[in-house]
From Swiss-Prot:
PANTHER family: ANTHRANILATE PHOSPHORIBOSYLTRANSFERASE. Gene3D superfamilies: Nucleoside phosphorylase/phosphoribosyltransferase catalytic domain, Transferase, Pyrimidine Nucleoside Phosphorylase, Chain C. HAMAP family: TrpD. This is Anthranilate phosphoribosyltransferase. InterPro entries: Anthranilate_Pribosyl_Tfrase, Glycosyl_Trfase_fam3, Glycosyl_Trfase_fam3_N_dom, Glycosyl_Trfase_fam3_N_dom_sf, Nuc_phospho_transferase. Belongs to the anthranilate phosphoribosyltransferase family. Pfam families: Glycos_trans_3N (PF02885), Glycos_transf_3 (PF00591). The lineage of its organism: Bacteria, Pseudomonadati, Pseudomonadota, Gammaproteobacteria, Legionellales. It comes from the Bacteria. Pathway: Amino-acid biosynthesis; L-tryptophan biosynthesis; L-tryptophan from chorismate: step 2/5. The keyword Chaperone does not apply. Homodimer. GO terms for biological process: L-tryptophan biosynthetic process.
Length: 344
């Protein structure tokens, strides 16, 4: 599709067909479009607002172009779109250790920051984790720690063509929405946080279109892309071909309604400090938000468990020291694997 025709169509607020969307995403991901053309496309899509069909088509192209990794099943991913502008610490990354410590295999898909102060990769590198691992090394992490981090640039090399445009735009774009939809381990269960409740049903429907077995798509009424400790959060759950909407408040599960001030960070260093305090068993708002969001993943991963029981499993994973042990064990394992590969 010629860029001029594409831009005219989007300027007139006309949605793209699935075929058109696949063609355009392919052009963005193969260097056919320039940085200016990619940025223009992303900005116009944001103004028009992306549809279920457009996102499904885009995700299919991204999945086709990805370097896939087979880590077996069942697996879960806990991921947010980002773009909420709130600069909270890396909650979903912290939850990954808790959920893995609860005995659930986690394939955490993440990247460096584009629009926030600390992406999951920024935080993990600050903590000393090695992210550039081979497929067999990633499998080793899953086998030994129940958890592996899938560094997006390694699995989505085509994304390099859009990186400059995204960075120069500096705003939330289509790719924030796509990130949670293109886990290279092809997970069938996911907790996905979105930056606005307007996107809940859309993202849940796209996940269903892409073959998800079960998903929870979450947004809080104060604009977080996760379950909040400062407001009610809305959930759209997809399971067995059906969608269900429900709400979560911290008070419903014996947790305090708290200000977000205590969980805002300015850097990966601050985010790491908060995560380590939570995993060490410290109480407070950071622990509470990790409990709530870890519970969402446990609830999504395990059939027949209540949300109350999921909160308790998350609490035990932290207070037993297992989550902290998982953090330290995985960090050491990634360092050891990296040294071994460097000596080969």
């Amino acid at each position: 599709m010629k860029p001029k025709l594409l831009f005219e169509q989007l300027l007139s607020r006309q949605d793209l067909s699935s075929d058109q969307m696949q063609e355009v995403i392919h052009a963005c991901m193969t260097g056919e479009f320039s940085d200016v053309q990619i940025a223009t496309f992303l900005a116009l899509m944001r103004m028009k607002s992306e549809t279920v069909n457009e996102l499904t088509a885009a995700a299919k192209v991204m999945r086709q172009l990805a370097h896939k990794i087979d880590l077996g099943n069942p697996l879960i991913d806990i991921v947010g779109t980002g773009g909420d502008g709130r600069n909270t610490f890396n909650v979903s990354t912290a939850c990954s250790f808790v959920v893995a410590a609860a005995g659930i295999k986690v394939a955490k898909h993440g990247n460096r920051s584009v629009s926030s102060r600390s992406g999951s990769a920024d935080l993990l590198e600050q903590a000393g984790f090695i992210l550039n691992l081979s497929d067999s090394q990633v499998q080793n992490c899953i086998n030994q720690c129940q958890l592996a981090f899938l560094f997006a640039p390694h699995y989505h090399p085509a994304m390099q063509h859009a990186r400059a445009a995204r960075q120069q735009l500096g705003i939330r774009t289509l790719f924030n929405l796509l990130g949670p939809l293109i886990n290279p381990a092809q997970v069938k269960r996911q907790v996905v946080g979105v930056f606005s409740t307007n996107w809940l049903k859309t993202i849940a429907t796209v996940l269903a279109n892409l073959g998800s077995e079960r998903s929870l798509v979450i947004s809080s009424q104060d604009g977080l892309d996760e379950i909040s400790i400062a407001a009610k959060s809305e959930v759209v759950e997809y399971r067995d071909g059906n969608f269900k909407q429900w709400f979560i408040s911290p008070e419903d599960y014996g947790l305090k309604h708290s200000s977000l001030d205590a969980i805002i960070v300015d850097s990966p260093e601050q985010s790491l400090h908060l995560i380590q305090s939570v995993l060490s068993g410290d109480s407070g708002p950071a622990r509470d938000i990790v409990l709530l969001n870890s519970a969402a993943a446990i609830y999504c991963a395990k059939d027949g468990i209540s949300f109350d029981a999921s909160i308790e499993e998350a609490r035990i994973a932290i207070d037993s020291g297992k989550a902290n042990h998982c953090f330290n064990k995985l960090r050491l394992l990634t360092q050891t694997l990296n040294k071994e590969s460097n000596h080969e």
